[in-house]
């Protein structure tokens, strides 16, 4: 989007996630094998899951020549967590009561309650460590510690990089130069990789996978993970403030049809919550929600609603989002619910439509842990709660359980808690989650990658520039 910014607190699409991962690093990272490991932190420790100590790597330099110290970490986190912050990561850090430097290479973070999964949180792509001066960071700076130095950035257009000769990671960042181009048009993206104008594309339209697979110079790279496509209803906006209406819409969707016609089988059914089978505490025991016209009509009549309901859609959300919205409208029509699909422009979609209009199409990369996913988009104090589900009795109960689960070390008890949170979201929340999608890329065979490719984000967890190389 032309509103994109180098302020990592505003990152909201794969173009910016990849840009940040290319010029910056985080305290922790998710490896290509899906495992959590230290990045700018060399090690971490906690005796009670409430006080966390991160020991920093020594000798790491920012692109401006400044040596990384604990002050940079403190200033970065303070930027994202201060009361006036508009950072999407602010909700992730509300549990942090204090963060302080203990010498130049040690950071101590105090939480208001134990959270065994906190090291995952500090790997969030928004929490990119930037250099500080007088206790502050320049949020608009493109200076980081990553494998590539940002050369040029045109919002919504392109970003170019040169290899960082002083990169601290061994065996990483193999390209001399990297250029990322924002191609929102699916056909343009496909043509670019087929013609050799680009070496790789992400978010391949499932409809073109078979075509691209026949191109002898290309490899189709497909990874199942936590990526899911959603249609968030803002529960504080009419008519979605009515639970019966929300349930009517949830029961009006032919999910298998969406998986078959939109994903062409490159994914699986969703059950109106964001936790996938790749997550440790997926609630497999919840009944799969199906197209149920009788139940949908019962709820619709109980809602008292009549007239047209608008669903804003754009393929900026995901390939085939407009078609998916049309299928939802068609199945709802069988029930007797009138849905008008509003085609929204791709440019500015994330700024003007998502998290603003009452009902729209969306995608979420998902997160490796339940708490991280909830902290990003479902708890009551995150900016990215795109359903605004915060104050219903079930939402209050959900938030309470999430806080309890963070401190619960008994695995069976945590599982029970997280299963209950998934039920609460599915039955009361505003998220329609009809399907989980595989990450699909088309990559030139002149580009090589490791045996493992991360599924936490597209493009090898956003770190393709660091992890891939010329074949």
PLM regions with names:
Residues 45, 55, 89-131, 152:
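Surface-exposed binding/hinge segments that line
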Residues 31-35, 115, 122-173, 177-179:
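Gly/Pro-rich hinge or "lid" segments in bacterial periplasmic/extracellular proteins
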Residues 136, 166-211, 338:
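Ligand-site clamp/hinge motif
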Residues 441-471:
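Long beta-strand-rich cores associated with HINT superfamily self-processing modules
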Residues 338-348, 375-445, 471:
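Extracytoplasmic/peripheral linker and loop segments enriched in polar/acidic and small residues
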Residues 1-48, 78, 143-145:
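N-terminal lobe/hinge region of extracytoplasmic solute-binding protein
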Residues 65, 330-383, 417:
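Periplasmic binding protein-like
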Residues 269-302, 316-322:
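Structural transition elements
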